């Protein structure tokens, strides 16, 4: 079967959303597509399509993220949504679309790119497209139900579950006031700058990004701030997912100044309250600082056996992808499928 490649334009949206609903690992609604690709404050994404007879049969997309890379803010293009109609698999659809996207990303000024591939796309990225494997990201978890742990070990699916009904109450936890946030402001910009000291390379965390990524999202996220003496000491974002038969709450983001373990514990306590009773576990990718990891251990978290694939590729001759295990920091909110 033959196909041609085109850059996305709005007349293709309905067919593209239909393809993602059928075969995509991330099933975007029309509203989610507009939010993710058209309203991203870092710029509209790069979306390449394979089309045949007026139908979208393949897609590969990249989104832009403002990134602190070696201490300097730059804009990286990151592969996100990938899907190929089953009738066209084995014909090089993804490889062709991804190459076109990487050329466009390089032209846009992105010096390199990284992503979190699934088991199907990983060998294509590495063997055909020249990406390199980087240190995998280990997931941490706090079990919330003993029965959930047993089901997971036995490979048995549980109930879907979900977040509790939202509460607007402020609570005093570990000496800090933790309350829901309806909007992020300049105080998060300052907190993000302080937290960045312990993050190495990472997506920039500020009010503009958080407002778009979480509060403007069609998805259900709960955002909380921890306050000490009236000042913002930390932020947590909580969501829920059901993957591989496991009902899990997840910390999409957790931001605190390096060494502020008390703020971490206060935010985690509120996150647990949001998902307890509706999830088997609360999971996250931990911050790199030892004090924050100690706080997570005290709050009942432990490393799991699950590691997420992480790969990268230089797009310019003078760029290098840092292979060190401690060179990058990501949260689950940095993934398009959480």
Which ranges hold each PLM region?
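Oxyanion-binding "anion nests"
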Residues: 195-227
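Short amphipathic alpha-helix that is part of the acyltransferase structural core
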Residues: 1-57, 72-78, 155-208, 249, ...
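Conserved acetyl-CoA-binding loop-helix of GNAT-fold acetyltransferases
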Residues: 84, 89-103, 260-273
